[in-house]
From Swiss-Prot:
PROSITE patterns: SHMT. CDD domains: SHMT. It is found in: Cytoplasm. The record marks H224 as: Plays an important role in substrate specificity. Keywords: Amino-acid biosynthesis, Cytoplasm, One-carbon metabolism, Pyridoxal phosphate, Transferase. Its EC number is 2.1.2.1. Belongs to the SHMT family. This is Serine hydroxymethyltransferase. Homodimer. One of its GO terms (biological process) is tetrahydrofolate interconversion. It catalyses: (6R)-5,10-methylene-5,6,7,8-tetrahydrofolate + glycine + H2O = (6S)-5,6,7,8-tetrahydrofolate + L-serine. It comes from Lacticaseibacillus paracasei (strain ATCC 334 / BCRC 17002 / CCUG 31169 / CIP 107868 / KCTC 3260 / NRRL B-441) (Lactobacillus paracasei). It holds the Pfam family SHMT. Pathway: One-carbon metabolism; tetrahydrofolate interconversion; Amino-acid biosynthesis; glycine biosynthesis; glycine from L-serine: step 1/1.
Amino acid sequence: MDFMAQDPEVFGAIHNEEERQEHNIELIASENIVSPAVRAAQGSVLTNKYSEGYPGHRYYGGNQYIDVVENLAIDRAKKLFGAEFANVQPHSGSQANMATYRAFLEDGDKVLAMDLTDGGHLTHGSPVSFSGQEYHFYHYGLDPKTERLNYAKIREQAEQVQPRMIVAGASAYSREIDFKKFREIADHVGAFLMVDMAHIAGLVAAGLHMNPVPYADVVTTTTHKTLRGPRGGLILAKAQYGKAINSALFPGIQGGPLDHVVAAKAVALGEALQPSFKTYAQHILDNMQAMVSGFEEDPHLRLISGGSDNHMVLIDVTGYGVNGRQVQDLLDEVGITTNKNQIPGEQNGPFKTSGIRVGTAAITTRGFTADESKRVGELISAAIAQRDDQPALDQIHQEVLALTARHPLS
């Protein structure tokens, strides 16, 4: 019996989601579109296998081919980022972070990381996250004038806090991060340096953003976002920390790995090792700069930090008298998918927010050009400006449909 006949409800929901992706412009910075090969690996018979442990040291039999796949993923990750050690088993970036904290820290240890409202992540010490509940996090923010990292100020905070670990990396920061300066700060106070490069991993792989691996003791990342792989996590580190990281992940916080996802990671890492991936990553940056130029023409929109060095930009939308949630919902109506996002000095709270975050990874995968990316930025401005004009919004939606029709998902 085929899928549709066996379970029409689930099949229908998946079909509808496929249609949504096909006919919407995806600008959520943490999302991308995987290749057919990655999807094939993730939908393979490897989903049937259980393989607690690591290659050559499993708690179940019949893992000889699973070992081949996992070793390929490990070797490719190490080669791609120049790492001494890689663990490809984390189910997510959050679990990669949890395992890393447990490998390096004791409960209650002090950690210095980026504040969530200034661009950090929940797992960087938010009180609603395990990280903020198990460890004593202190936070650095952005310079209120430049809305960029102030390394001198971070150094001062590190001197005051004397943390066991410093975390560099962000989920909503549009400027390049200087990991060498973070290494110097960590050395100055005798702290471990952890880098969470989940958003920029693809740019790092392509040589278009500073690589944190030579500077950090440990680097965590997701394998989706700009890396264009399956949803999952990855840990890279100095060889001396490998045993502790492996133990912290399994049996520490996970049981068996998701072998079908590990296979998809291996495929995606192999794709990222190809010369064409650097061209793709450069197009992500080119498209973002073009989109920024479209936003800059609108005096009612303010770009946080004035622009972008990577695949994303944060936009303060309050100049229009609206909040981020309202803009997110409005853009959904015209077929443009974004997410509301807090901005530095947030006044509206996390559920309404003052801004939105947009990224160009997914539209670049679809083949959008720089001119089309600029036009998308202009359409966003037009939709907000004409939010009470339904005929105008309908016309914008038609243009969105025309753009997506030029660039089918596959």
